[in-house]
Amino acid sequence: MSRVTLASGQQLMFPHLVERAKPGVIAVLPNGKRFVNEADSYHDFIAALLAATPAGDTPQAWLLADRRALRRYGLGHARPFPFTPTAWLRTGYLQRGNTLAELAKQCAIDANALAETVERFNHFASAGEDVDFYRGASAYNRAQGDHQVTLGPLREGPFYAVRILPGSLGTFSGLQTDEHARVLDEQQQPIPGLYAIGNDMSSVMRGYYPSGGITLGPAMTFGYLVGKNLAKKNKYKQ
């Protein structure tokens, strides 16, 4: 996710769900190196970021795009043409450099490593194969691209970058419940009249995230069961 500051001063977080996979966009660490298949799911993206971050350092990455990619796809909260990046540059949300070296300086990225990374990625884009992270090799990757294409070079300046930080979409810890969504006490017995669903309930996925929106199905299912149970109890009371 990236942190957006609006003109009002309000801050919000923007999820980077799609544009990571578009041609002309890559993600790098402050050391200037790629660390992930950018077209993989956001869950895998952040898992790779956490794994690549040295102990004690802040997990962060930079999402980079050249002029063509920004104009066509946008970058995070910065929208594509016909919008211009002026407002996002003014707030500091976007960083810009006429060259990769200038952009690296703006973002405190290792300039030499970044130049090597972009050159290597551009070679992959021309060859049609990412031998480092296999971006575009899966149907999922290609579905996130532009008409099945996810590899594209970064060649046309100015170049742009936005800072990426880990965010959360759901939880894997919460109140223990039974199959009726009744909250359990320390003896694993239902607490009368107390239910929990959604992110308040201990996730049935137990820390895994097999698919986008995976928190929604269980919330709807157990919400239905709770409603059904309560309706039955009210019927008996009447």
Which residue ranges define each predicted feature?
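Residues forming the flavin
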Residues: 1-238
